[in-house]
Amino acid sequence: MKLFELQPAPGSKKLPKRKGRGHGTGNGKTAGRGHKGQNARSGGGVRPGFEGGQMPLYRRVPKRGFTNIFSKVYTEVNVSALNAFDDGTVVTQELLKEKGIIKKINDGVVILGNGELKKKLTVKAARFSKTAAEKIEAAGGKVEVI
């Protein structure tokens, strides 16, 4: 077999429908748009959420709640993810980002207790859950709130 002999599997390449190219195609004249009306025109159609003049759902449903501008968003990391580090490592928020465990630090990192920790680490983070702190200390590590 040579490179120039390669071809796609039969039936894997389908030609697009050529609309408005004669009635023999089954898609001639109106090109599948029907006769006249808003949807037959170029740029025709209604905006998303428009219900034909009836009061739309997004306006019938009441507004609720607000976004608290003072809320803190923490990036969550489980203790099982900390096994990626070597024994005796000082794990910081920046190191977690560098290693690719988290994408963004946000307002800080919170360590949660899901999974098992098999390494002895010193972990520095904004917050720790009770179980996470217990598991880190049980593995012989240290917990430091920053």
Curated annotation (Swiss-Prot):
One of its GO terms (biological process) is translation. Residues 42-52 have a biased composition (Gly residues). InterPro entries: Ribosomal_uL15, Ribosomal_uL15/eL18, Ribosomal_uL15/eL18_sf, Ribosomal_uL15_bac-type. Residues 1-57 are annotated as: Disordered. Pfam families: Ribosomal_L27A. Keywords: Ribonucleoprotein, Ribosomal protein, RNA-binding, rRNA-binding. One of its GO terms (cellular component) is cytosolic large ribosomal subunit. It comes from the Bacteria. One of its GO terms (molecular function) is rRNA binding. Binds to the 23S rRNA. NCBIfam families: rplO_bact (TIGR01071). Part of the 50S ribosomal subunit. Belongs to the universal ribosomal protein uL15 family. This is Large ribosomal subunit protein uL15. The gene is rplO.
